[in-house]
């Protein structure tokens, strides 16, 4: 693969976002065959795919253990056997297993077809907004252009903004050319109470049984709502929510945004695909997901916590429901532009994961394929901890000739990492091509994402775990 062609999506290259991403988009509905990626080749039952992925991951891990005997002896001689075994397990063995499982899953993945319904159900869109005067008009513009035949109710939920969010949103609603099947209004709650409270109030005001949530700075592709609904109606009947694919909108703003573009385009997208294939999508993210009202009410709505979307998602899973994933239902969001904003966001995500474990730990013991991914998330805490406290100092030591931690064998995970990045790039590029989107060049962002992004992200994740475990005051840190 030519590395010069590796790139991430961009929707702000000298044009208005709306004109740019709609290029090549059909005005009419696609047939099920054209609108869904079904894949070709030999059909394999899902349990067999799961078994094959597990077998490959176990075999790769066994090979890694065999190759690491000398490394283990050297590190144990310099420290002790227990430390050496724990360090190498979380530096090499476990990441190797994860990469091998992810790689084999991506190779085996075939998106199930969507069924186009005869009629589309009415849908309420909840737009959570706090100090979004700069972005809310674009968000509403994207909603006004939705190619959706059913009725749409748009509720802008102003959570006590201190800027002109209400005025800008109200003016946009009055000026935009909404279709006859679309209604829109602003609910101004006056006081900032948190995103969960605003969404729960919006749910009580909503008139329809399908509830879509987006953030006040998100931009939804023209067929985004339609494809989310089609996926929800096409998936098994126990599916009560579907997560859309969220990508980066402001990738040209600075170097940090360019790196995050790859995180969304590759990292997050590959994990969502993996979980979705095994009926185990763990998070219907608040930035762009659709829910059935019944499931929201049975789960008690959005909980008052910093990670309300993941805790709600796990509550839905605990009710024995399923969450799906629509890889071609696209929305674009503005990511943090400063190190401080990025750190606060990822700390919030890490706290949300710990909140979900504390609230819904029985999910760890369900007899489902998706239980593997719950345990996968359990491993994040020691993985991030060892990476931050052991591997990063080991990299510094390697610069002075001490290779006990970061030695030649640590590169054993690189072949799998390169392979799955190449595969997910090809998959994602195919999605964008079918959607009429441009994949722009972003080599420098990719190199930073591949070589140094973890050095920034993992310590922040550890920070989030610690403050949640120690019970520090909860605060919604905005972007």
What are these regions (language model features)?
Residues 158-167, 191:
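A conserved acidic beta->alpha catalytic loop
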Residues 66-93, 102, 106-108, 117, ...:
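Membrane-embedded multi-pass helical conduit in multi-pass membrane proteins
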Residues 104, 178-180, 188, 196-204, ...:
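Long helical/loop segments within the catalytic core of UDP-sugar-dependent glycosyltransferases
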Residues 211:
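Short aromatic/hydrophobic "clamp" motif used to bind/position activated sugar donors
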Residues 121-124, 153, 311:
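Cell-envelope/extracellular polymer assembly enzymes that use nucleotide-activated donors
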Residues 141-151:
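Short, acidic, metal-binding catalytic loop of nucleotide-sugar glycosyltransferases
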Residues 137, 163-172, 223:
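Acidic helix N-cap motif at the loop->helix transition within catalytic regions
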Residues 2-119, 428, 457, 464-467:
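N-terminal membrane-anchoring/stem segments of glycan-assembly enzymes
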